[in-house]
Amino acid sequence: MESKSSSLPLFFQKPSGTQLLGLLSVLLVGLAVLISHQPQLNPSNILPLWVPVLVSAIVAGIFGMWIVPLLRRLKTGQIIREEGPQAHLKKAGTPTMGGLIFLPVGLAAGVIFAGFDPEAIAVALVTLAYGVIGWVDDWQVLRLKSNKGISPRMKLILQIAIAVVFCIWLALTAPELTTITFFAGLSLPLGVFFWALAGFAMVAESNATNLTDGVDGLAGGTGAIAFLGVGALALPAHPGLSLLCACLSGACLGFIYHNRNPAKVFMGDTGSLALGGGLAAAGILSGNIWGLLIISGIFCIEAVSVIAQVTYYKATKDETGQGKRLLKMAPIHHHLELSGWPETQIVGAFYLINLGLVLLSFILT
């Protein structure tokens, strides 16, 4: 294995953060251009998606040049968990709350590009609401100088409350969404059970993206690819929502300029909770909950790896209270780290896998 690995080009063994930024830029712009050249997806009367992607990326990158020093002056240094990978301890003190870079830019640009479309505004408000939960959590962590913010119970209650309000609004304005459409014309009418599934998807997605935010550039990059994928699935029926997703995708790309390895800023819960909440809301509103599941494959695996680790540990506890672990550490990106994968190799692999999932969603929806 070692000889095979050493024969790979250096980029595939240990790419730099700047190389990964370049890779992500090519993937996003290339995908946006590809979508824009599909008349059935992006009719001529709809702005090509690559335009909002590029505009938001540039604006977010510039905005971050002001926000990062501000966060540093406000002493928003990240508290690193001692039980995490030891290599991460050197990251202590890196400013957090980096979601303040891409959320204002992505949401404002998205609503403007969408012409203040009601669907875009609704998803923007959901994204902002989840971001506020994350901001409060980040602020509590910094105020108490510990790694514990608001209680998990309170965080969950707030996440559920936002999901319930959004689902009630959807039930009143778009009751036809209760039928899930799969590939080959297959469909599944769920009736009122759809809203329970939709609410669960929003809360689960928000927490899954939060778990994914553990390596420089990982959550922001995979979130950027996922948002563009969901935006493409929303076309041509939901052009305003699609433009919002494209702007959030581009804003995440601009954020990665500052978050690439070695990161100058972390997104914190401010950004990671908002990513998942916004993705889920966009997928549900556009009637693409099946496509959302496929595109969110990386986030699902991250969440399942944590659930499996905890469940297996509890199930194998002996009389001393010690259990066995399925992984060296969860989520799975930490397992790969402790297995010898460089951070940047993990991030690059996840970017490519996520792109593959987006393309798969196009085929299967």
From Swiss-Prot:
It comes from the Bacteria. One of its GO terms (cellular component) is plasma membrane. One of its GO terms (molecular function) is metal ion binding. It is an enzyme of class 2 (transferase). It holds the Pfam family Glycos_transf_4. Its cofactor is Mg(2+). It catalyses: UDP-N-acetyl-alpha-D-muramoyl-L-alanyl-gamma-D-glutamyl-meso-2,6-diaminopimeloyl-D-alanyl-D-alanine + di-trans,octa-cis-undecaprenyl phosphate = di-trans,octa-cis-undecaprenyl diphospho-N-acetyl-alpha-D-muramoyl-L-alanyl-D-glutamyl-meso-2,6-diaminopimeloyl-D-alanyl-D-alanine + UMP. InterPro entries: Glycosyl_transferase_4, PNAcMuramoyl-5peptid_Trfase, PNAcMuramoyl-5peptid_Trfase_CS. Keywords: Cell cycle, Cell division, Cell inner membrane, Cell membrane, Cell shape, Cell wall biogenesis/degradation, Magnesium, Membrane, Metal-binding, Peptidoglycan synthesis, Transferase, Transmembrane, Transmembrane helix. Catalyzes the initial step of the lipid cycle reactions in the biosynthesis of the cell wall peptidoglycan: transfers peptidoglycan precursor phospho-MurNAc-pentapeptide from UDP-MurNAc-pentapeptide onto the lipid carrier undecaprenyl phosphate, yielding undecaprenyl-pyrophosphoryl-MurNAc-pentapeptide, known as lipid I. Belongs to the glycosyltransferase 4 family. MraY subfamily. This is Phospho-N-acetylmuramoyl-pentapeptide-transferase. The gene is mraY.
